[in-house]
Amino acid sequence: MNKPVLVSFLVSGDPNPDATLKFMKALDKYSGVIELGIPFSDPVADGPTIQAADVRALSNGFKIAKSFEVLKEFRKESDTPVILMTYYNPVFKRGIETFVMQAKEAGANGLIIVDLPLQEATEYREICKKHEMGTVFLAAPNTPEERLKISDEASTEFLYLISTFGITGARESFEQMTFDFIKRARTTCKGKICVGFGISKGSHAESLIEQGADGVIVGSAFVDIIKNYGDSEEALVKLEELAKELSEGIEKGYEKRNK
């Protein structure tokens, strides 16, 4: 991840596992990383768009093993890094080491456990290190300097900067607070920083990359397309179109940053 990248998020199994595989392939062309969300019944960090996607997947009988199967199929055609996003409960129930080993075997490059605080993640980090599984932790605009440093050190893939307070979901524009946070993280952190929450168009990506981000994470905007078009050719076209627009925005932001 040398040049800034698009990190594209999908909910695994929404509306069905076969569709997820097709959607991953459609986004692959313009994505530097794919983030695959494992549906959970109580996704507290997610807004209504992704919560509804979780419900759609779970109501179709989704099981965690299906996420691993989809990823294995994707790995037959692509080596684009894939980060699995989940909550702690499903990992704990399966057993941390079992989950990490199964994710690794399926072809995952890293994990995000959204509701696992860094101070409680010692065992998890040790297991990930043992199995060469990447880790991603989150930081918010009010994260103190020292915690930002520790979160950066604990994140082997990238640090996930939450652009604003609250839950995920598309918004019109970003406040100065977000840009200030990127600049602060840029000076504090040694690793890669990617910004998520609320990004839905090329102009968003452009402004965030221009401020110094190494990547933008886009979820709700893609999931909205899937909600509206379902498992269809039109969904594939719309997903690829949006990924292209975002990718072009990233490129423009990178050019501006390097002028």
UniProtKB/Swiss-Prot annotation:
Entry annotation: catalytic residues: 35 (proton acceptor), 46 (proton acceptor)
Residue intervals passing through the bilayer: none
This protein's UniProt keywords: Amino-acid biosynthesis, Aromatic amino acid biosynthesis, Lyase, Tryptophan biosynthesis
Disulfide feature: none
GO cellular component: cytosol
Keyword Ribosomal protein attached: no
Matching Pfam families: Trp_syntA
EC class (word): lyase
EC number: 4.2.1.20
Reactions catalysed: (1S,2R)-1-C-(indol-3-yl)glycerol 3-phosphate + L-serine = D-glyceraldehyde 3-phosphate + L-tryptophan + H2O
GO molecular function, one term: tryptophan synthase activity
Pathway(s) this gene product operates in, as recorded in its UniProt entry: Amino-acid biosynthesis; L-tryptophan biosynthesis; L-tryptophan from chorismate: step 5/5
Function description: The alpha subunit is responsible for the aldol cleavage of indoleglycerol phosphate to indole and glyceraldehyde 3-phosphate.
Assembly information from the UniProt record: Tetramer of two alpha and two beta chains.
Record family assignment: Belongs to the TrpA family.
Name used for this protein in its record: Tryptophan synthase alpha chain
Organism: Methanococcus maripaludis (strain C7 / ATCC BAA-1331)
